[in-house]
């Protein structure tokens, strides 16, 4: 009787259109209920039975019910699922498989089966890649996934590496492929094998891609010759190896090992500027004036060079600081090191005055055992030898940026626009409240930005600097020349690491076209998009493996009285994040550990401060002592507590 009743259908339609709805993202809690977050200000409660239809992170449209003045959300339509492809641990019970996603807020096992064509016999504890196939809001009875790839066994000591690489869909191994002979590039190569080129790297480095040689000229000028490994002498554009390198975009450096962009035969041997071996190179010769400026007379050319010494950062630094027993192999090498130190001092002084110099932060190195166990974490400060190489490379990249801009008008450039124009008024107001006056338009210019950075660097603490970081834009990779505000330079194009960066290989080919007087094609924007995406994924992978190893390293310190100095790096509503000074681990201090009475505590992300009873007790950049309260291995998170 009611089946096709148009009035009833109309009534249903009316009710449906009058019912309030909201779109938002589901946030799960550990208690079974959840919230629909519509925006930063508004969220609705989702009761536990309704949470069974959704997953943390799902974007949904929900019906909003009001009962006794209490609002709650009933998820109705899935806009975008949080999980599509994911990694997790397999559970096997009575021959039935399920998988628990590796995510701090996803605790429930999802029923699953192996996809057709996946031959591995999955066992309890295995790690796998899975893809979601069913979702309750799509009309399915429940969640369901398919296992698309076996990652490794639960007991594998190298789980942190394999799981992280699978999560970000990154390669596990060096690419296959060989380059048997050098290409005929129609390039005249100068013979520089008699010159005393040296390489300075970590003692364990095999992929040496830069060698340096300095000559003193009259008029207190120094001539610096930078020779860079030449993989494009072996790899033709559009070849199989070139396409592999284009996809990988970078060598992926993870704690303990790297996954190279090029086959190891090339990166660690044929192209590597090994001591005592003749190698093709792309070379830049420049003159450094007495005040550290680079003269306009920049010369790029192809050459054959032979490194006369493979030097290690620590040895060179010790020798220059008159420590330790190491001595250069000959007076000629000693003379090179002294001249390189002069180059470094001149360039550093010039950049301090005319551009910007990053503050030295230590690198943290994981010392690993045979089974991936963390034996130690060593802070390696950036010493004089590191700075020699850094200043030489920055100078060479400035030269390439100028030459590519003036001769071609394009290349692969690293650009950084400084502050986001939409937020400079806010920035000026914030700085003014701390007694610093800046013009909102002035900081959008390179000189204005540099002036502000120098003023911030002169502050007694880094607190103000940390407050304005959120107004800064991100560095980008562009085919158009443009300023790099972060370095304080008008243009910056890297070409000094072609073994490990595809963009540098592209710039090599463009520089070679200039050397030969040939025309060149502008790199495609898709290539720079791929580079930016790979850079992001590689950084995330490095961070994820690091978090896992830090958790392993600090596990036996949990609940003990071991004290660690820690710098506060961020304040949020729930507490504050700190970085342990000695090893670089990031830990979280929950708000209740800061003060027991919640109403007397204000944690402000906006101000970067923690106030107790109206008084600022902690602020970002403060260094405090902490102990490790807990290490949660399943989420790789470290919980710390301030020492009273």
UniProtKB/Swiss-Prot annotation:
EC nos: 3.1.13.1
Gene Ontology biological-process annotations: mRNA catabolic process
GO molecular function, one term: RNA binding
Main location: cytoplasm
Reaction catalyzed: Exonucleolytic cleavage in the 3'- to 5'-direction to yield nucleoside 5'-phosphates
Gene3D superfamilies (alphabetical): 2.40.50.640, Nucleic acid-binding proteins
Keyword set includes RNA-binding: yes
Lineage top rank: taxon: Bacteria
InterPro entries recorded: CSD, NA-bd_OB-fold, RNase_B_OB_dom, RNase_II, RNase_II/R, RNase_II/R_CS, RNase_II/RNase_R, RNR_Ribonuclease
The entry's keywords: Cytoplasm, Exonuclease, Hydrolase, Nuclease, RNA-binding
Domain RNB, chain residue ranges per copy: 189-516
Entry keyword annotation includes Hydrolase: yes
Compartments, as annotated in UniProt: Cytoplasm
Function of the protein: Involved in mRNA degradation. Hydrolyzes single-stranded polyribonucleotides processively in the 3' to 5' direction.
Similarity comment text for this entry: Belongs to the RNR ribonuclease family. RNase II subfamily.
Protein name according to UniProt: Exoribonuclease 2
Organism, as annotated: Cronobacter sakazakii (strain ATCC BAA-894)
